[in-house]
Design a protein with these regions (language model features):
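Bacterial N-terminal signal peptides that target proteins for export
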Residues: 1-9
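Sec/Tat signal peptide C-region and signal peptidase I cleavage site
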Residues: 17-23
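A short hydrophobic/aromatic micro-motif that marks alpha-helical segments and, especially, helix-coil
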Residues: 18, 116-117, 141-142
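Extracytoplasmic c-type cytochrome modules immediately beyond a signal peptide or single-pass transmembrane anchor
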Residues: 25-137
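Inter-heme linker and motif-flanking segments adjacent to c-type heme-binding CXXCH motifs
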Residues: 126, 148-153
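The canonical Cys-X-X-Cys-His
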Residues: 138-149
Length: 153
């Protein structure tokens, strides 16, 4: 009995969680503002992570870099959800190719998620050399996606 109740609750939660995703697509400003906020989260945490990784300022990686890496990893994981089908509208820096080549776009997001996960592991290990390599991969992942899927400023 408990198992079937748990399954029913889980199914209901999944359905309820999916509804706002489709119900809000008609609100371009909300989608664009949220996307920009998540991307800005990545940008600012990346800047801070790079500084800490380079020892400027000299702070412990397993404290400061760890916090930034967690935020970056979490935000990177959200990226595919930020561009659902039907949200290609409004004033945005996202190119149409985000939706036209969703598989390729999601592959770029996966590369970023993997790079931020490597950064997180380096921070946990307090390994500055590994953190530096991971930050290079984060930068490459961001640039690769921006080159293909973001309008130039």
């Amino acid at each position: 009995m408990l198992k079937s109740v748990s399954s029913a609750l889980l199914a209901g939660a999944l359905i309820a969680g999916a509804l706002p995703l489709h119900a809000e697509v008609d609100n371009p400003d909300a989608w664009i503002k949220y996307r920009e906020s998540v991307m800005n989260t990545l940008k600012y945490h990346s800047r801070a992570a790079k500084a800490v990784t380079e020892g400027k300022p000299a702070l412990p990686l397993n404290v400061h870099l760890l916090a930034h890496a967690r935020a970056m990893r979490d935000a990177a994981g959200f990226i595919p959800d930020l561009f659902p089908e039907g949200s290609d509208f409004g004033e945005t820096e996202a190119k149409a190719s985000v939706w036209e080549d969703k598989e390729g776009f999601d592959a770029h997001a996966k590369k970023l998620a993997e790079a931020t996960d490597a950064l997180l592991k380096a921070a946990e290990a307090d390994d500055r050399a590994a953190a530096g390599k991971a930050m290079q991969q984060v930068g490459k992942a961001c640039k690769g996606c921006h080159d293909d899927y973001r309008e130039k400023d």
